[in-house]
A protein has these predicted regions:
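FIC/Doc superfamily catalytic core
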Residues: 1-240
Length: 240
């Protein structure tokens, strides 16, 4: 059984049989770790062991983040994939801290702040909008690209999408129409691609917090197990 499957099974055990607080922590960790797959990243065994201590209540989330930071600072034997694992470990711990809170600042500033918090200690440009145009080739589009917004228009575009969503009323619409509307909002926000890196993970975390805040019970399974599918669906939805 590969390491990825083993990680999922361990967290599933907590979710099935653990105390309520342990279930919640395990579900959040599962989501945070699963989201790293959108960039082909995998967490280390050390992160998994440290996450378990947090789930068991032995340490708090800030201690987790400090332990992960110290682990990589003090590591004497470097491995080829250490940089990628370090990113995955730190970002997973950061996302876990964010998703452990029930509050969200549903604004452009709040969205940008999520990027800063998710990538704190990882990217120098965390919390900064890109100041150049980007294109990305996508294998799912046979090497073609999605059209990302010009950098000059980024702030205005985020403002517009969030204000449109803020003005929308979910009252009286069917479940299917709710899903369509939410999908359109999340997809549109992602297409702006305001950051140099980390757009999918930032958008996913922001969406989870927002949906919780308006009373939706968010099933984290999509992000925990199928984050690569989530990203590819966003790419396809924005392909013209």
């Amino acid at each position: 059984m590969d390491q990825k499957k083993q990680n999922i099974l361990d967290f599933d055990e907590y979710i099935r049989q653990g105390e309520p607080s342990k279930k919640e922590k395990a579900s959040i960790w599962q989501t945070a770790i699963g989201l790293q797959a959108v960039d082909g990243l995998k967490t280390s065994d050390y992160l998994k062991e440290t996450a378990r201590k947090h789930i068991e209540g032995e340490i708090d989330i800030d201690e987790v983040r400090q332990l992960v930071k110290t682990y990589y600072q003090s590591k004497t034997q470097r491995e080829p994939d250490d940089d990628r694992k370090q990113e995955a470990d730190k970002v997973s711990a950061n996302i876990t801290k964010i998703l452990s809170s029930q509050s969200v600042d549903f604004s452009t500033g709040g969205y940008i702040a999520i990027h800063r918090r998710v990538f704190e200690g990882v990217f120098k440009h965390a919390g900064k909008l890109r100041d150049y145009d980007i294109t990305k080739r996508e294998w799912i589009l046979d090497g073609d690209t999605v059209n990302y917004l010009n950098w000059e228009d980024l702030h205005r575009a985020i403002d517009y999408d969030i204000e449109q969503e803020r003005a929308f009323s979910y009252r009286g619409i069917s479940s299917d129409d709710m899903v369509i509307h939410i999908s359109h909002f999340v997809s549109g926000l992602w297409q702006i691609h305001p950051f140099a890196e980390g757009n999918t993970r930032t958008t996913a975390v922001f969406a989870i917090l927002y949906l919780r805040s308006i009373g939706f019970e968010v099933n984290n399974d999509l992000f925990a197990r199928h984050s690569w599918y989530f990203r590819n669906a966003l790419v396809r939805a924005n392909y013209k």
